[in-house]
Structures are given as structure tokens and as C-alpha cells.
Regions:
Chain B
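Short, functional C-terminal segments
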Residues: 1, 143-196, 200-201
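Low-complexity, glycine/alanine/valine/leucine- and proline-rich hydrophobic stretches
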Residues: 174-241
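Long, charge-rich, low-complexity alpha-helical segments
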Residues: 1-166, 221, 226-281
Length: 348, 281
């Protein structure tokens, strides 16, 4: 089992770069889950009626959004859950789109596969993007199936020049099809290849540079993979080019024997918060998302995690409501003063 | 190894029904050389081992996740079938199913698309069918409920619109069933079995054999179903192809006689409008 290393020396981190125009800092968001639909939409509707929260111009010119009534600045939708013909899923997308900034996060782009790209999948994603008008479209730097058979898992790729060339060419085609840049997330992995010719961070960076796409930096995945492969999580965080980081993900993990597993069924761990702080010190305020996919807690509990992320961003960068970097913001100071479990909607 | 060869090997090992170690042994046994340990060396040449876990153990994490993830989704999709054939039976069913019908869709939503057909028709399921002859029908019914949940939306023909039309205007409308409506015929009484299965009882065949005609639909984002008599089933089948209401009434007159047909057609129409089954083609 790899020895855990001391993780932090914040003093050596550098100043935040300017954000790319297509990767605005949206603030802190959460992944929307079915069990929270009713509460989120009701809070949003109350906010839209002016009963709570702020109506904030998010800078997109598309619509005013109401964010503070829900305690976060934006939501992420899992793309495949909404790539269906109709019914409740698409009604949820329409309602969410009217009220909140959204991101679409996929798990099945299969960008690293040796199979051809699937036009039908890209058509469905494009159709969903037209409905959701997301600020980001993201997926994972991995493969999920081959020979038209899906494993429904985020399988790691060999870190070689050939794979970089292969994946980057596919990312460019996807971006051409969607008419925008996407961001790819580093995945948690439990195996690595003898053919690996570089570090994971060099691999992630090379693809982002070669394809001119963004990186969705999942801090929990950095930590999980670093633990599982005996690599240096701090060096990983420090090596990712800041201007390529479009978004950050935070989640919890579990232990299984000698390995860590990216289960998204626990709170974010202390060591991941510490790594996040290091990342934010270096990157500046970046759109940050809390993921919680299994053993899903109450919405209020999820907001506690979001508030922790917000507090770190504010403390490290000085970013807050009204900050020039914040295209969407919220009155987090009011929120963080509330007791856990007794959260009320906030009127700024 | 090329990327394709690497991914193909990993995919086969991960999807092997008895786990990675058994897959390696089977690979050796089926190779022309029958050389023991050859497949393991191939795996170890590809995937790094270290002091914490060897290559087979690391790949095994993905293999376990593959099966448990899909099993979890299918258990949620087919709760009454699980209730009928039990946890062990359902695990065996999913193992066999994935061998023949690996997931072809990017979304887990469609992983169970062919389960009912597999259960009803595949040779590998002959013993299961002999013990639970109704399981295939039950699976088909449960899948239809999933299918209508997120079927395409459309403008429902409501009572309000109909009440604003003159009788002759309504008679000219070409009516269809909405995309969110399914008509299904079963050889077994699936509704009783499904009710038992979803109430935590073990669905058992009660000897009430006989065809069941069922309509399944979505209304206000909820999924509904009800049984149909043969005549209403036939009427809805006509509407599924598109028909003017007048033509339907003429057909009903042939079936029921001139006296009974108008009243029956009006009753049907009232119910169909109330259930939100109809659209104007």
C-alpha cells in the first residue's frame, strides 16, 4: 500500500490566471439528483416569484436566474439521464434551465475508445444541449466500451503518445459537432498499464493542449488515483495547467482493501478538502461542484458540503458575491451562518 | 498491443461471468496450446501489478463493478420479476442475459431492453420458463411501464378541446394514441402478478390462466395501467393505427349492433379522454 504523503504547502502556490471566456466561474454548484427535484424546483420557483433569494443576471444575456433560494450557484445534470424522448426528465431540464445556470456532465461519450464516435449519441447530446443551454459540457477522459459493447464504467487509458493523438483528434471532432469546447475529467483508476510512458497529469495536459479542450479537475479522483498508484497528489494538482481548468469536482470515496474507490457516497474527506484548497490557491476561483451519487443525503446536507467549498474559495481568493470573477454569485455569508439542518432561504 | 486489442481484452475479462481468474483459466483451456498461465502472463504484461494488488485483482474491481452496477439497475427495472424468481434466480438470469445481450446502449436506462425477450425466448432460459412460465410476460409488462415513463411528449387531446368542437368537427378528427401509450397482450394475468410482486409478496401463478390485454400509459408524469376487454383492446388497436371516431363507431356497430354501439363508443371516448390516451394525428 502506498505511503500517504504530507499533502500541503500552500505557501508555494501561485496567483490565479484569467479564466477562459467559455469557462466562467459560476461559483459553487451541486449535481442534481432525482430525490432533490421537488425541493430544488420549489425553492427555485419561490425565488423566481421573489419570495426568497436574488434574481441575478448571470451574464449570459439569456435570462435572469434565481440562485440564492437554492443555496448554490449552479447545477450539474448527468447528460445520459436526460437523453430520452420526453416525460419528466425533459420537463426537469426545461424548468431548471429557466431558473439556474446548468452544466451537462456525461459518462458515455467514450472518447478514449477505439470504436468510432457515435453520431447518434452526439446528436442526442447536441439536442439536449439546445434544451439545457449549459455553461459547460463535460465528460470523462476514459473509455467506456469497445466493439459496441458498453461496460458502463470509466476505464483508464494507457498514457502513450499514440493514445494522446487518438483521443485529441476525437475531442476535436466532438467539439466541431457541438460547436463549442468541452472539458474532460480525470478519472479515478484502480489499474495502470505497463506501457504508460508518462505521468497521468502529463497525459491529461497533453490531450487538453492537443485538442484545445478544457480539464475538469476532479480533486477526489486525483487523490484516489494517487493513493492507488503511489503517485504524488500535490504534484498532480500543481502540474495541471491552470488556464485549462474549466471546472472542479469534489466528492467522497470509500476504502476497499488497499485501494480507494470513487464511490461518491460519502462526504468529501479532509485530505481532499486540503488538496482543493491548494488547487484554488493556484487556480483562483473556479466553478466547483459537489458530487454525491449514492447514499444520497438530504439537500440540506449537500448544501453543507457546498458551503465548505465556498468558504475555502472565499478565504483563499477573496472571491465573493460581486467579485469581478463571479459571473453568478450568492450571499454565502448569510447562508453559512445558519445551523445545519435548519437552513432557510436567504434574502440578501 | 494496439489500443483496440487492449480494450477488447479488458472488455472480455471484465465481462467474464465467473470473474477474471476463471476467465484467464478458460482462456488457457480454450487456446490451441492449452498452456497454463499464458493468459495470466498476457494480463500481467498489460496491467501493472504492485505489492498492494496484482493485475488480476485490480482488473477484478472493474469486473465486480460491471456486474453489480447493471444488476442494480435491472433489479430496479424489474422488481416484480425479482420477487417472482428470487435474488439468486435474478442474479443467474442477469448473468446469462449479459452473456448473450451485453449492453449496446451508452445509457444504463436501456440495459434491460431485451430482458423480457431473452426470458421468453432464449434457449438458455428453458428451465427458468418451465418453473416460472409467467416471468417473461411479467418482465415485458415492467419494461412497458419504464418505456412510457420517458416516452415522447405530445399534445394530449383533452375534454376541453372536444367540448368546444361541433359533433361534425369532432367526427372529422383523425385520432391516434399518444407516444406515451402502449397496448400489450399477455398469455398470463400479469396485473395480479405485478401487484403481488410490488407489494412485497411473492408473485405466484394462481391458476387463473388466460390472456390479459393491458393498456399502459403516462399521465401527469405518472405511469398507469389497466386491463382491457377484448373489444376495447381491438378499438384501441384501431386507434393506434389512426382512425376517425366515426369510423370507429361504424366498426363498433358491426361488433355490437346499432343499438349498443353509440353508448359503448361514448363510454370509451369519455374514458380515453380522461386517461389522456388520445392525440389528433
Amino acid at each position: 500500500m502506498p505511503a500517504q504523503r504530507p499533502l500541503l504547502n500552500l505557501a508555494d502556490s501561485s496567483v490565479s490566471p484569467a479564466r477562459p471566456a467559455d469557462a466562467p466561474n459560476l461559483g459553487v454548484g451541486v449535481g442534481l439528483r432525482t430525490s432533490h427535484y421537488a425541493e430544488v424546483l420549489e425553492r427555485g420557483r419561490r425565488g423566481a416569484r421573489g419570495e426568497s433569494g436574488d434574481r441575478v443576471d448571470d451574464g449570459s444575456g439569456a435570462q435572469a436566474v434565481c440562485v440564492t433560494s437554492v443555496g448554490v450557484d449552479w447545477f450539474e445534470l448527468l447528460s445520459e439521464n436526460y437523453m430520452v424522448p420526453g416525460g419528466r426528465p425533459l420537463r426537469i431540464v426545461r424548468e431548471m434551465q429557466e431558473m439556474f445556470p446548468l452544466a451537462l456532465h456525461g459518462v458515455s461519450l467514450n472518447i478514449g475508445s477505439s470504436d468510432p464516435l457515435r453520431p447518434a449519441y452526439l446528436d442526442a447530446l447536441d439536442a439536449l444541449a439546445r434544451l439545457a443551454t449549459p455553461r459547460f459540457i463535460t465528460d470523462h477522459l476514459c473509455w467506456t466500451g469497445v466493439s459496441e459493447t458498453n461496460l458502463h464504467d470509466l476505464m483508464p487509458l494507457p498514457y502513450t503518445d499514440e493514445v494522446i493523438e487518438h483521443v485529441a483528434a476525437r475531442v476535436r471532432r466532438v467539439q466541431d459537432r457541438l460547436g463549442r469546447r468541452i472539458a474532460l475529467e480525470n478519472v479515478s483508476s484502480y489499474l495502470s498499464f505497463n506501457d504508460d510512458a508518462m505521468s497521468e497529469w502529463d497525459f491529461v495536459t497533453a490531450i487538453a493542449e492537443e485538442a484545445d479542450c478544457g480539464i475538469l479537475l476532479d480533486i477526489n479522483n486525483v487523490y484516489v488515483s494517487a493513493h492507488n498508484h503511489g503517485i504524488d497528489a500535490m504534484k498532480y494538482i500543481d502540474s495541471i495547467p491552470a488556464e485549462r481548468v474549466f471546472q472542479i469536482h469534489l466528492a467522497g470515496h470509500s476504502t476497499s482493501g488497499s485501494l480507494l474507490i470513487d464511490t461518491h457516497d460519502h462526504p468529501v474527506t479532509d485530505v481532499v478538502w486540503t488538496l482543493f484548497e491548494r488547487a484554488i490557491k493556484r487556480l483562483g476561483p473556479v466553478s466547483t461542484l459537489i458530487e454525491w451519487d449514492d447514499q444520497i443525503p438530504t439537500y440540506a446536507r449537500l448544501l453543507e458540503e457546498a458551503d465548505k467549498a465556498r468558504a475555502i474559495i472565499e478565504r483563499v481568493t477573496g472571491w465573493s458575491s460581486g467579485s469581478p470573477n463571479a459571473s453568478v454569485s450568492s450571499s454565502s455569508k448569510s447562508r453559512t451562518s445558519e445551523s445545519p439542518g435548519e437552513r432557510r432561504d436567504v434574502t440578501a | 498491443m494496439s489500443l483496440h486489442e487492449t480494450q477488447t481484452a479488458i472488455s472480455e475479462w471484465v465481462r467474464a461471468p465467473k470473474g477474471v481468474a476463471a476467465a484467464l483459466e478458460e482462456e488457457d483451456a480454450s487456446s490451441p496450446q492449452r498452456e497454463s498461465g499464458r493468459a495470466k502472463r498476457r494480463l500481467e504484461n498489460l496491467i501493472r501489478s504492485d505489492e498492494s494488488l496484482d493485475a488480476s485483482g485490480r482488473l477484478g474491481i472493474y469486473a465486480n463493478a460491471y456486474f453489480s452496477r447493471i444488476l442494480g439497475v435491472l433489479r430496479a427495472d424489474y422488481p416484480a420479476v425479482v420477487g417472482m424468481i428470487g435474488d439468486v434466480g435474478f442474479n443467474d438470469l442477469v448473468t446469462s442475459y449479459l452473456l448473450v445481450e451485453p449492453s449496446r446502449s451508452p445509457s444504463l436506462r436501456y440495459a434491460g431492453l431485451r430482458l423480457a425477450d431473452f426470458l421468453s425466448n432464449h434457449d438458455a432460459m428453458a428451465r427458468t420458463r418451465a418453473r416460472w412460465p409467467e416471468a417473461g410476460d411479467l418482465a415485458a409488462f415492467e419494461w412497458a411501464r419504464i418505456d412510457v415513463f420517458d416516452a415522447a411528449d405530445g399534445p394530449v387531446l383533452g375534454r376541453e378541446l372536444v367540448s368546444r368542437l361541433a359533433p361534425e368537427e369532432f367526427a372529422e378528427l383523425f385520432l391516434c394514441l399518444g407516444e406515451w401509450v402502449r397496448l400489450r397482450a399477455f398469455a398470463h394475468p400479469v396485473l395480479q402478478l405485478w401487484r403481488a410482486g410490488t407489494n412485497g409478496e411473492i408473485p405466484r401463478f394462481q391458476g387463473t390462466s388466460g390472456e390479459a390485454h393491458v393498456v399502459i400509459w403516462r399521465q401527469d408524469e405518472k405511469v398507469f395501467h389497466r386491463s382491457l376487454d377484448a373489444l376495447e383492446e381491438a378499438a384501441l388497436a384501431k386507434l393506434s393505427l389512426g382512425s376517425r371516431f366515426d369510423d370507429l363507431c361504424e366498426w363498433a356497430a358491426i361488433e355490437l349492433g346499432d343499438e349498443a354501439a353509440p353508448g359503448q363508443a361514448a363510454t370509451w371516448l369519455e374514458r380515453w379522454l380522461s386517461d389522456g390516451l388520445l392525440v389528433v394525428a
